[in-house]
């Protein structure tokens, strides 16, 4: 009976598993979407007064041109794999064996850390996606370069795809964090109830024992 009382409520387990599944799915989606943001051809129209006479010069842009995006793909992929392990331990191992008790806290820290760090780095890179053109001007991929006096086209799809991937990574981090918080609160609540119940039963047992001796 004492072991049964220590089990976390079913709704806690259900919410935790749902959060982990959602986090894993979002992490996979973020990695896939970011990794397919490639071979985007951006056309930069140089100013007519420049040496290039207003000619549109093509530049192929891919996510691998930006290290933070590469980091996000790797981190999201690893996080999804680790979450799959966590789901296996919770669903099939029931969290009972020693290996599960050791791994679950580590996974609970590692997965959000990976996702949050990768998302933060990607957000910083998204705010300044640009490259240096042949005439030495810094060209923004998502918007025209006012300083150069020219314009950029062809980067809309790339920018949209990158932005969505970053937000998916953030959503995955939040989902995993919520699952961990719910699991932690549920476990502490069930543990506290078990201690109080055992304490009260112990006290009542002592009282009954004393009364029995009086007779």
Swiss-Prot record:
A Pfam entry, by short name: CASP_dom
Annotated stretches, region: Disordered: 187-215
Subcellular location: Cell membrane
Segments on the Extracellular face: 35-68, 127-161
Bias-annotated ranges (Low complexity): 195-205
UniProt key word DNA-binding: no
Topology with respect to the bilayer: Multi-pass membrane protein
Intervals, Cytoplasmic compartment: 1-13, 90-105, 183-215
Keywords assigned by UniProt, alphabetized: Cell membrane, Membrane, Transmembrane, Transmembrane helix
Annotated TM spans: 14-34, 69-89, 106-126, 162-182
UniProt key word Membrane: yes
Domain of life: Eukaryota
GO cellular component terms attached to this protein's record: plasma membrane
Subunit composition and interactions: Homodimer and heterodimers.
Family of this protein: Belongs to the Casparian strip membrane proteins (CASP) family.
Name of this protein: CASP-like protein 1U3
